[in-house]
Every structure is written in C-alpha cells, then in structure tokens.
C-alpha cells in the first residue's frame, strides 16, 4: 500500500506522543497511584523532615527575591508606577522606586541604578537585605489586588548588580568646580569612626557635595561593619560590600583600618587636636547583650553570642574579607539559638552551614511578637529550623564542662499586657551548642572614655538629636545603631544621609555661609552622565533626540512647558488648522489596545484613538509658541499644521506658524480618521501628487525647515516620502498611526462606542504594536533617500527602542503612547538610557553585552546554576528525584570542598573606554547595511536550535510549537521532560521565540548540510 502523504510517518508519530490533544473523555487513576506519581514531578520541598538538605559549607544565595533579567522585566512590567507612590514614602532613604522600576521595565539598568544610588549609596546591600515587607512593599498599592505587591527588593538588587558588572567608577558632580577651585570650607578635615553602612553613606554624600578631606577610621582589619561581619554570605556576599566601598573611594574618601575609637589613643579629643573639625560616630553597638546565666561560658564550652559566632562564619565564608581563609565554627548535633530578631535567624541558618544537625530557635514571646521580618523567619522555616515560643532561659545544663542542654521557664502574657516568667512550668532541651542573640550594646570602658566630652544617655550611648543627628557637642554627629534610631541597614544608611546634610550645614556656618533650609543632596554620577546626546538636524540643534509627538501629551501649551521642565528636547504642538476648520471631539475617543492580551493598567502595548486635531485656535498656538520659545530658547518647538488641499490655506497657516518663532513645521498629511472626510489629513497624504504640491506651496511660503508627516496606510510609503522630498520638504515624520478597529464586545457593539447608538469609526492605532511598521517605514525611506532627515514615531517607549529607530535611519524621535502609559518624567529614563547605550559601545570588555543586558549566565530562579552536570556526568531536570540527585551531589561537593562555589564569576570592577564614545549622529542608519532584498540572503549559512538543559524549566513550549507550527524536530522525554533537538531542525527559531527563559535556547551554526524535505522527489523519472 502506498504511503499517504497526509499522514505522519512512524518516527514522527513517536515524536508526537506527548503532543496535546483535545480531551474526549475523563480519565481514571487511583488516589494511591497519583500520590506516588506527583513525587516524580514535585519541584517544591516535601513537608517531611526526611527531605532536609545538608547545607554544610553551602553559602549559595538563598534569597527568594533574587531575579534574573527575565524575572526582573516581568516584575517591573507589573508595577503600576503610581502617582505619589506609597512605596517611596515607606522607604527610609526615600528611594524614587517608581522611577527605578520604570527604568528596569525599559531595560535601562544604569538609569535604575543611578536612581537607587542617588538616594542610597548602599543600594545593592539594601536590595539584598532590606526588610521590604515592613517598608516599601508594605505600602505597595498592588497589595489591594489578587496578584500581590511588587518584589521591590529583588528589582533593586537586580539593577544595581547589573551596574556593578559594568565596572564604571563613580565621579564627582560634573557641575562642581575642580577640587582646587572649591571654596576653602570644602577642604575641612572630616573624620568618621566605623566603616559600616552609616559611615559609608555619610562619607559618600559628603564627598558628592565636594568635600575632599574625609577619612574613615575602622578598628577591624576589614571594611563594611556588620554588613561584612554579621550578615551571612548567602544573604549578602562580601563583593557587594566591596563594590559599594569602592564607589565611595572613587570620590577620594580614605579608609584607615585597625584604628578604632578607644584604640591606639584615638578619641574625640585627639581627633580634634589633629585638626578634624567634624567627627561622625558610626561604630554600631559592638558588644553582645549577655544574660547572667551565661556568665563565664566560652566558645570552647559550646556557648556563643551572635557577636562571637557570626563574625567567625563570615571570616570563613567571605573570600576577600581577610587575607587568610579561616575555618568555620565546627558545630554538630542540636543547636539552640536564643532570640527572635533578624540576627537570631541569621545565627540559626548559619549554624546549619556549620554542621548542626538540628536547630531550635527559642524566644520569650509568641509568633505574633517576633521582631524578625517574615522573610528571615520563612527562610529559617524552609531550612527546617524548629521554633519554640514562650520560653525564657533559666539555667544552663553542663556535662563534663561543656554545654549539654538548657532549662527554660514558660512565659505568659497577663491581661494588662505585661509578661511574667512562670518557674513552675519547666522545659528541658538537650543541646550541644547554645547561641545567644539577645541584642547588642556599648559597654567597652575604653570606648566610653574616648567619647568624652559628649553626654551619654542611661544606656551608655550618645544623646543624639533625631533631626540633625548632632550630639551634645555641635561638631560631633552620630548615626546607625549607636544613635538609637536605626534598627535596620537601610535606616543606618539614612542616618548617614541625614547627618551628611547637617554636617554640610554646620561646616558652612563655620565659614559664614548660608545654605538652603531644604536639604538638596547631589545625585550619583559616573562618566555615562557626561555623554553628549545632542543632535543636529536641518541646522537645528536638539538638546536630545526625544520629543513629544503631536498628540494628547501636547494638548495644551502648558503641558509642553511642563514637558520642557522635565527635560524633553523638543515638542510638536497639537495639530492646528485655520479657524474655519475648527473641530469638536467626540467621547469616548482614546482606548486601550487589545494587542497585549488581558493586561490592565499601564504598560499597554497599544492604544486606539479617534481624536481629531486640536480644538484650540491657531492664534492660541501661535501665541503659545512665542511664549515657549522665549522661556526655553534651547528647546525645539515644531508647529504641527493641517489644511485641506488648498494653496491659499496652506500658505496662510504656514506663514502664521513661522511668524510665531517656531523652529520648524510639521505638515500633518496623515490623520487616519475624521479629518479625511473633510478633505484633510489622510485625504491629502495618500496621493504622491497632492503631497508634492502641498510641500511646494509651503516651501514657497516659508524659510524655516518643515517635515511632512506620513501615513503608513498606503501601499508604498517610500513613494510618499519621495514626493515630499521632490516638493522641497526638509524631511519627513514616519509614521502616523495605523488605521484599525480595536475591539467588538460580545453584544457586537464597538469600543469606543459613541452615543446611544454605540457608533464608531476606524481609528488610529499607536504604541508598541505598530513599531515593526514604523521601523520598516523609517528604514525603507532611509535606504531610498540617504541622508534625508527622518523624525521617527510609532512605538518608541525606551532608549532601547529609540536606538533601534536611530539605527534604522531616524535623526530624532517622537513619543506619545509611552507618555499615555506613564508621565512626562520618562524623559529622564530615555536620556540616561541612550547615554548608557552609547557609552557601553566604547568598552571592549563588554562587547558581548546586548545593550545594557549582560550575557545570560546559567541560572534557575535568578540564581547561578552550579555545574552539577560535571559532578554527576549528565544533565538532569530540576524536579522530583532528579532534583534530589542534583541537590545531594551539590551538598556532598560543598561539604568536601569546604564551600568553594562552582559557578560563573562576575566582571572586573573597573572598565575604561578604549574606543571613542559615539554620539547620536554616529549611530544613525548603522543598521541599513544589514537590510536588503530577500534574494541577498544566504541560504547556505544555516542554523539550528540548541537547548541548555541546565536552564530549561521543562515546559515543552518549544516542543509544541515545533510540532503544530513547524517541523516536528524536537523530542520530548516522557520522564525528564528535557527537549532534544534532532537533525530535522530547520533553524526556523519558533522554539526560541516561545521559550519563557532568556537564552535557554540559542541558535548555533548547523554542523551538517541542510537538505530541505521536498515531500516528493523533484522531477521524478517515470
């Protein structure tokens, strides 16, 4: 029997075994079998303690908040970027969270990092360790939605980590005079004691202000304070602290190690005698609170305070902290951790990594009174730490001179809220080690003496003004734990920030200078900020290439004024006509698109509008243009005008607009709705002859540049652009909106529907959905008319997309829908993003970056994937028994290798440009050499897909699209769900297009000849 061409071959049928099919009946399986089957596919841990993972020597990242680029982009897209954002109000350092998340969503990671570091010099540290659930996340408006709040800490960590990989140093504010030309007051000697978060923050802001004689004295051999010594490596790696210290040192701040308060004669008095006019105390609370029952116990006996234990763990696990590698504390058996704060849970999870078999966290009050943030407690719970509430330590049980247990008394809360210890209720716990984490204090007599002459409070710490951070001596300031206001790293950072302003104010007062009553601290700066993104077109110099299109964002002149104040380089007026052509709009008229699926809120991929031109008169716009040019002489204003096909009208309106002092004109020949019925807009712009004549009329009537705004709703936009060129236009705008019908409801009525009859018309689609059309138009015009100026519009919503249009041949960029999605402040993101994209082109070490995106490392859930396949000899998926095998192999390796990590490393910290930094003009039309006719494409250089099994999450999307939309070239293992590419792969790239993990699938050169499957022999011999 002859083979049927319309039936799959047997080998293809086997490939299709797991391909989805429409369900025709209900299936039946026993409960027992399903309980067993689920274990094979389980990704989350089993609830039983039998599944406990050995964590000894494993200091890999455990934070749930850590994000890959994919995760960061998805999370940033969810953010509403709210007005008067509550998250910002809940941040101690007042981070502009809305702005930095906006930058992340636009792939401008430097812009995000700049926003973060401008308000928080320890932005990466805080992104990793901030108790966000109690701060910014606690105020997120998305708490009122089903999907919950934004992972702000993870986004903050992601952006600053990417910037750290760029290796770009911090610089002084470029607007400051050189150090030699700064006033004498800025050479004041300033000392900071303690190199922890508060001092690093304070010194950074003082250096940004221009002070150049700043020294930090640190008693330890290492920097970073508690960030280094007490926060574990798996929460805060040492290289993060080093990165932030290096940024501070970039500004000239000096750090002196092994010289602390009360050490080697260092006192407040001695510093003053040495010529320091201001001292900032940021030494924390260096001694542990120690309950009386532990008096005399030592680490050799099995007793540690958190101040003993955590630094030992840090020195052994944080490579670079010390010159030599020390050993972890050797724990075993049962460990009791006393306390209910973040430090207690750090001790508990660290104990597991030091060999403890089981850890009990014991605290005096109940779960509802735990001081630790939920993130910390949850991490300990997931690692199978046990919690014992309502217990107060009463007596240490010893055996052979060592700790062998602890006797507790039950605590109870009375009706009046007070707590009592009931000694009749006794609990005995066996323990091999006890770690006390009952807080900290200052009780070193040498330090207390060195603090003289400032007054101390009843706790033995300085009296500090909560607003100025001054002590009782006006030249001495304090912050962080020792000041008594901060309980977290970010609050200590803010103490330093707050003090820096008042130190500045104090120093200037000594020199008779008055400064602003409102604090105004400098922003973070690096060389990226100095990149020139101005561009000249038609003899007009644009401060930057980003401007507002003639659209709803320029409804009024006052809106344009506000846009210029925010930094927009140019703006077009809303299109206006002669008074005889005045219009009145209908409503509703601007609606969200359906091109992004069911996404509600900002981030819409498109809008549809049936809005007409401006309802305001030509006189209004001409007077407004004159006002704006007078107040913003460096900004460019283009008057957008429209008439019917009438030479007298075009002549009159063009002359009127020119006399208003507009820098240029835009001829709107493309409005796709409403105006065409009046013989205007689209009615003029679809005929090359009409376009050519209108341009000739305007050229004859005016002397300033003008640009014809083209419609994409034509067969060949190049013909229209050529007509404009032949008519004397100085350039064109490409493109206006695409004519469309956005949505029909279930009852067949349209949206928008006007009036009782719910009538509509075809409107203009704008936004990202039309970007491919606009890019095609811009590149086609640029190829046909080399050097002809193009103002691009159509889906420009970021610096990255803007650069695409510049590469395609545009000179400047018009924006509308992106502002409708957000607000005028996006201009800061666009400018910084473009500066970064240009700057990074000059750094050879980053040649493998895609814009601001670093190469994707192998990861799962944003965390680097150790090369376990090298340990077990094969790649396995991350679920069920395979995950267990991988976890056990890694645990054994970690234990045997003393915690050395097998994973990719980051880039060097400092990268210096070795090539000239391109300007905007240098990148215009760079992509055109890659665009041409299909016949120019080489069909001998074939590629095929390659799946990275270590990054694959086993969803099978590649498999399904290849089966039902492609070439049945992917096998899908029924047990491991790992896809395998066969030689049948044609390199179509559908699999990569639907893969949810960035770079899990890559297209690589084909190693075997490609032979198309023709179905039947070509010209068979009969």
UniProtKB/Swiss-Prot annotation:
Homology family: Belongs to the dihydropyrimidine dehydrogenase family.
Listed SUPFAM superfamilies: 4Fe-4S ferredoxins, alpha-helical ferredoxin, FMN-linked oxidoreductases, Nucleotide-binding domain
Main localization (coarse): cytoplasm
Species annotation: Danio rerio
Keyword Repressor: no
Cofactor binding note from Swiss-Prot or TrEMBL: Binds 2 FAD.
Catalytic activity: 5,6-dihydrouracil + NADP(+) = uracil + NADPH + H(+); 5,6-dihydrothymine + NADP(+) = thymine + NADPH + H(+)
Residue positions binding FMN: 550, 574-575, 709, 767, 793-795, 816-817
Residue positions binding [4Fe-4S] cluster 1: 79, 82, 87, 140
Known function: Involved in pyrimidine base degradation. Catalyzes the reduction of uracil and thymine. Also involved the degradation of the chemotherapeutic drug 5-fluorouracil.
Protein name: Dihydropyrimidine dehydrogenase [NADP(+)]
Record-listed FAD binding positions: 129, 194-198, 218-226, 235, 261, 480-489
Residue numbers binding [4Fe-4S] cluster 2: 91, 130, 136, 156
Subunit structure: Homodimer.
